[in-house]
């Protein structure tokens, strides 16, 4: 499970929100990037009797278009904006940095401007890639960021825009999220059906995190005023090779796995 640190105190998201933090009226929730794995998970676990939901994807709304985003926000006036939209393919970000910054940074800026203008709370989904990853101990919310990739730098820029434009924000950094859609788990399962051998990085460490668990902590936080930056993952740590081993074991699939360094891995890190 995920344990959130709220103002220096541990609070279990499975416990009821204190009465003074509850919202009296139905929340109007705008989920941006709703068809992705986190957006889909939020829609699966939320209570439709508690929340009115607006779902948008790039087909309905271009978050890089400031006027389009402002018009949608002002017309619909959400209570909460959850930004799940992002370019997460690290290789694509390196090849097309302009695209990465437009979506991951400017998109977050535009949504946070709407949040400030309408008084909405803003949830920004971020990543552990805002750190350099060279440390052998876990990073905290108070550590300095130092991204080494275009993806990480663009996501940090998005965080900074959110902090600049609205104080009513929740920035959630997570990693190794799995759920519906294109992710490491599903790529391992696909490889097991199409290959005899798979090379997996054993020098990358993280905490595999259920998209549904992450969705639940988001839905918990938006009912509070505990604004700030959070590291939100499931408990436990492993490397990519160990993660793939467990995925195949649980799925009952057989394929030869070989531990390698990241540069030799068959699968991208996203």
How should these model regions be labeled?
Residues 66-103:
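NAD(P)H-binding glycine-rich loop region in Rossmannoid oxidoreductase-like domains
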Residues 160-208, 213, 219-220:
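NAD(P)-dependent short-chain dehydrogenase/reductase
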Residues 217, 224-268:
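Mid/C-terminal beta-alpha module of Rossmann-like enzyme folds, strongest
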Residues 154:
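Active-site helix of classical SDR
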Residues 87-90, 95, 128-149:
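Active-site "gating" loop of Rossmann-like NAD(P)-dependent oxidoreductase/epimerase domains
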Residues 53-69:
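Adenosine-cofactor binding site in Rossmann-like domains, unifying the SAM/SAH pocket
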Residues 95-123:
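NAD(P)-cofactor binding segment of oxidoreductase domains
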Residues 29-45:
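N-terminal Rossmann NAD(P)H-binding glycine-rich loop of SDR-like oxidoreductase domains
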């Amino acid at each position: 499970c995920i344990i959130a640190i709220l103002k220096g105190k541990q609070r279990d998201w499975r416990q009821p929100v204190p009465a003074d933090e509850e919202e009296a009226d139905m929340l109007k929730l705008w989920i941006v990037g709703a068809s992705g794995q986190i957006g889909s998970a939020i829609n699966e676990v939320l209570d439709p009797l508690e929340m009115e939901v607006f779902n948008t994807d790039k087909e309905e709304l271009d978050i890089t278009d400031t006027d389009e985003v402002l018009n949608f926000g002002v017309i619909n006036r959400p209570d909460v904006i959850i930004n799940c939209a992002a370019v997460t393919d690290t290789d694509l970000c390196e090849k097309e940095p302009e695209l990465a910054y437009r979506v991951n940074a400017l998109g977050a800026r535009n949504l946070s401007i709407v949040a400030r203008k309408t008084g909405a709370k803003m949830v920004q989904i971020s990543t552990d890639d805002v750190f350099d990853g060279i440390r052998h101990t876990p990073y905290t919310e108070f550590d300095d960021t130092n991204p080494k990739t275009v993806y990480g730098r663009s996501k940090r820029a998005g965080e900074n825009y959110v902090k600049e434009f609205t104080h009513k924000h929740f920035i959630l950094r997570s990693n190794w999220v799995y759920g519906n859609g294109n992710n490491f788990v599903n790529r391992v399962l696909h490889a097991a059906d199409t290959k005899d051998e798979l090379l997996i990085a054993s020098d990358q460490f993280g905490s595999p995190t259920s998209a549904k668990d992450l969705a639940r902590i988001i839905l918990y936080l938006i009912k509070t005023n505990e604004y700030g930056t959070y590291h939100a993952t499931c408990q436990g740590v492993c490397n990519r090779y160990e993660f793939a081993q467990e995925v195949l074991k649980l799925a009952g699939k057989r394929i030869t796995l070989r531990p390698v360094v990241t540069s030799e891995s068959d699968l991208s890190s996203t």
